[in-house]
Amino acid sequence: MSTPTPLSYKDAGVDIDAGNALVNNIKAAVKRTRRPEVMGNLGGFGALCELPTKYKQPVLVSGTDGVGTKLRLAIDYKKHDTVGIDLVAMCVNDLIVQGAEPLFFLDYYATGKLDVETATAVVNGIGEGCFQSGCALIGGETAEMPGMYEGEDYDLAGFCVGVVEKADIIDGSKVAAGDALIALASSGPHSNGYSLVRKVLEVSQADPQQDLNGKPLIQHLLEPTKIYVKSLLKLIEASDVHAMAHITGGGFWENIPRVLPENCKAVIQGDSWQWPAVFSWLMENGNIAEYEMYRTFNCGVGMIVALPADKVDAALALLAAEGEQAWLIGAIAAREGNEEQVEIL
């Protein structure tokens, strides 16, 4: 039996006009990220991008990521303008560790009912992240899926492609005993460990608006992930970088070994930097063991760089000039037998 009144897509919960309004709202953010290699404009079936002419043997490097349950906090506290930066950061920081310059980025935004204001804030944040990393936002997908998401909930995914000269790929193969380890400061928990963060908030019954070192706790927790691309591209050009590790899910124990040869281990001096207050707060209020902290969070270190010991002073000076806070935190040593590849003393 048919319905007596004609049905439309909007009656089913999908508002095409809202989608068009979103596209119109984000045009300026997209335009701001445009690179000379990008061909065509927003709205095509596919996005076109030439390879930069400076590369003789270009190798494409791709990555995809999300923001995890940090989104839950952002949605609950209506802080939508920075999770887009998180999304870009998680992707482009993974590319830079291999020496790749990010070229272009695409996003996927899914929700049950499209709120144009919220989505605009999110995508403008994505545009800001792309601008910070020199990456073109060339396309994306906004999926309005009634019945799939509750209330104002939404999810994000990002996809990034970069390029590196074949001879300049950084893969950890040059790492050797005696190399120094430099750490670049994080801006906070970045986008990892938020299921544990939310559990600590729940169990401790803490007020997220409470003051922590001069600003609300929730502001520490929603601080956008730091993007290291431009400063590290300059370091790569000026120095002899042997490896880089992006400290994400799995923390120190899981991420550092990903860039080390089997015969090497990282020996880190745990007192060589001070944990930001938010990590000490999480550890204390969640009664979290130190090992678990290093396994879950970046503990104030967003990126680790391995390079020859005689390059340390120049590298630290360059990073400081680029606005990075960085420290010498350890060295590479020879690994024997089945020793762990990361030691924190």
Swiss-Prot record:
Q: In which pathway does it act?
A: Purine metabolism; IMP biosynthesis via de novo pathway; 5-amino-1-(5-phospho-D-ribosyl)imidazole from N(2)-formyl-N(1)-(5-phospho-D-ribosyl)glycinamide: step 2/2
Q: Where in the cell is it found?
A: Cytoplasm
| Source taxon at top rank | Bacteria
A Pfam short name = AIRS
Key word Disulfide bond present:
no
InterPro entries in UniProt: PurM-like_C_dom (IPR010918), PurM-like_C_sf (IPR036676), PurM-like_N (IPR016188), PurM-like_N_sf (IPR036921), PurM_cligase (IPR004733)
An example GO BP is:
purine nucleotide biosynthetic process
Q: Which GO terms describe its molecular function?
A: ATP binding; phosphoribosylamine-glycine ligase activity; phosphoribosylformylglycinamidine cyclo-ligase activity
| HAMAP family with a match to the protein in the record | AIRS
List the protein's name. Answer: Phosphoribosylformylglycinamidine cyclo-ligase
Q: What is the lineage of its organism?
A: Bacteria, Pseudomonadati, Pseudomonadota, Gammaproteobacteria, Alteromonadales
